[in-house]
């Protein structure tokens, strides 16, 4: 793929200089459409309750679940509301899950004077064998028992369950199903290889020299400043770069200055200022050569709740001179040469990881596709805007490439849906710790990691042998 193209011209590296230098034109993007408008906030009113988003989520998802239930269990299955249940009568119920978790952090429990509890330390997982599932619809709620994986499911998931109500007031689940993958448009054929580079977690301002070296190597490769003619020819096939959040390091979050009185910090400079200047210079180099989409992340200077709004252009006075720089939302969706991309900076996957037994980030990505919702745990354990007319996190259309950023390691796989949908799942690793980015081939939907690691591992080996400084 990418490396094979570079190998075809590798012999030119040690060749004598020629009178004329080879030039490689950047592969143009035939069509591009930014489809992230549903994630743009027209108003910012936080006076509403979050019950509205759960209600509209259930209203939007119910037709998909009823249709899928009838396909799964037959058209004769009876779909009822919770208020219509009769003990012992088998039926199907569609509702929203609530997961009662004993280990889930609660600020009300921690500040309660009568409990006087010490705040529990952060955990990697908050699941417990005693967790229970409760199904809610518009009018009632009922506890679930039976053949359903309590540890895997999370609050906010809309699903259909088949079973019957029992005399003890619980619903005995015999089977359950999700809405599954949304409809998908076919990918138009491409005659040449074109690549989209996915990068996340640059972590600028963290103070790591190894990370800065890898970042500059990344920029030099993409802009054609590094390598022989073969590598430069391959770099010309990168039609777009997507930066998936956490452009700044978590070290730039100066909690100490936030907690201090303003008169004590009046003459101090925020730690993120230099990091933003550095980011502006990097974006300047990239956008001068290739279109760049910049998504915000957890540690970046924008709103914390999902959907995160684009970074303000005033922070990038150098890079915004180029029209190729595009500041976008998180989540972000776009169609590039007929291939529909949808991705996040990773907060939704990390939150599901904490409140579910699922361990693999690719498994969580696939699961969110199956339940047809980007972030079911929002707004329960992940902050989001209190929408009330529509839930923008529901998949209206199945993407061809679905990615999440800032994962511990790289991973990719292709899954298929019941209606011949084909989706490439990509876990984009945190660049500051792995020095790895991802290349997606738009023609074949193949994905490969590309590493920009310097001499960190070699230096550690030398020190282990007693040869290092």
Swiss-Prot record:
It comes from Mus musculus. PANTHER family: DNA POLYMERASE DELTA SUBUNIT 2. The keyword Phosphoprotein applies. It is found in: Nucleus. Keywords: Acetylation, DNA damage, DNA excision, DNA repair, DNA replication, Nucleus, Phosphoprotein. Pfam families: DNA_pol_D_N, DNA_pol_E_B. Component of both the DNA polymerase delta and DNA polymerase zeta complexes. Component of the tetrameric DNA polymerase delta complex (Pol-delta4), which consists of POLD1/p125, POLD2/p50, POLD3/p66/p68 and POLD4/p12, with POLD1 bearing DNA polymerase and 3' to 5' proofreading exonuclease activities. Within Pol-delta4, directly interacts with POLD1, POLD3 and POLD4. Following stress caused by DNA damaging agents or by replication stress, POLD4 is degraded and Pol-delta4 is converted into a trimeric form of the complex (Pol-delta3), which consists of POLD1, POLD2 and POLD3. Belongs to the DNA polymerase delta/II small subunit family. This is DNA polymerase delta subunit 2. One of its GO terms (biological process) is error-prone translesion synthesis. InterPro entries: DNA_pol_a/d/e_bsu, DNA_pol_D_N, DNA_pol_delta/II_ssu, PolD2_C. GO terms for cellular component: delta DNA polymerase complex; nucleoplasm; zeta DNA polymerase complex. Accessory component of both the DNA polymerase delta complex and the DNA polymerase zeta complex. As a component of the trimeric and tetrameric DNA polymerase delta complexes (Pol-delta3 and Pol-delta4, respectively), plays a role in high fidelity genome replication, including in lagging strand synthesis, and repair. Pol-delta3 and Pol-delta4 are characterized by the absence or the presence of POLD4. They exhibit differences in catalytic activity. Most notably, Pol-delta3 shows higher proofreading activity than Pol-delta4. The modification Phosphoserine is found at residue 257. The modification N-acetylmethionine is found at residue 1. GO terms for molecular function: DNA binding.
């Amino acid at each position: 793929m990418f490396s094979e193209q570079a190998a075809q011209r590798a012999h030119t590296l040690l060749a004598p200089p020629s009178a004329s230098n080879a030039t490689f034109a950047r592969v143009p993007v035939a069509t591009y459409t930014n489809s992230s408008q549903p994630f743009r906030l027209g108003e910012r009113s936080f006076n509403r309750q979050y019950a509205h988003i759960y209600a509209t989520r259930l209203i939007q998802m119910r037709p998909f679940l009823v249709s899928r239930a009838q396909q799964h269990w037959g058209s004769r299955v009876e779909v009822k509301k919770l208020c219509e249940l009769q003990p012992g009568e088998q039926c199907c119920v569609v509702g929203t899950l609530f997961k009662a978790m004993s280990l889930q952090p609660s600020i009300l429990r921690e500040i309660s004077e009568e409990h006087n509890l010490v705040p529990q330390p952060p955990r990697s997982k908050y699941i417990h064998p005693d967790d229970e599932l409760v199904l809610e619809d518009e009018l009632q709620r009922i506890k679930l028992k039976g053949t359903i994986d309590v540890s895997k499911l999370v609050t906010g998931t809309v699903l259909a369950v088949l079973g019957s109500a029992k005399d003890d007031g619980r619903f005995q689940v015999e089977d359950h199903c999700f809405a599954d993958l949304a409809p998908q448009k076919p990918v138009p054929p491409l005659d040449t290889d074109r690549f989209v580079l996915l990068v996340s977690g640059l972590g600028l301002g963290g103070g790591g020299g190894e990370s800065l070296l890898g970042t500059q190597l990344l920029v030099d490769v993409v802009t054609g400043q590094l390598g022989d003619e073969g590598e430069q020819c391959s770099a010309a096939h990168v039609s777009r770069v997507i930066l998936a959040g956490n452009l700044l390091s978590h070290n730039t979050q100066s909690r100490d200055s936030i907690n201090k009185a303003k008169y004590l910090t009046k003459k101090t400079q925020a730690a993120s200022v230099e990091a933003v200047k550095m980011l502006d210079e990097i974006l300047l180099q990239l956008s001068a050569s290739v279109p760049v989409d910049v998504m915000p992340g957890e540690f970046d200077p924008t709103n914390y709740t999902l959907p995160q709004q684009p970074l303000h252009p005033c922070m990038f006075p150098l890079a915004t001179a180029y029209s190729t720089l595009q500041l976008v939302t998180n989540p972000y969706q776009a169609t590039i040469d007929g291939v529909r991309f949808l991705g996040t900076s990773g907060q939704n996957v990390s939150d599901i990881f904490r409140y579910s037994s699922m361990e693999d980030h690719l498994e969580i990505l696939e699961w969110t596709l199956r339940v047809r919702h980007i972030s079911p745990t929002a707004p329960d354990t992940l902050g989001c805007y209190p929408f009330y007319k529509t839930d923008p996190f529901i998949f209206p259309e199945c993407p061809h490439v679905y990615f999440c950023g800032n994962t511990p390691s790289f991973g990719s796989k292709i899954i298929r849906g019941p209606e011949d949908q084909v989706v490439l799942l990509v876990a984009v690793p945190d660049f500051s710790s792995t020095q790895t980015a991802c290349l997606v081939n738009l023609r074949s939907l193949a994905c490969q990691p590309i590493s920009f690691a310097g001499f960190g591992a070699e230096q550690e080996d030398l020190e282990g042998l007693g040869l290092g400084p």
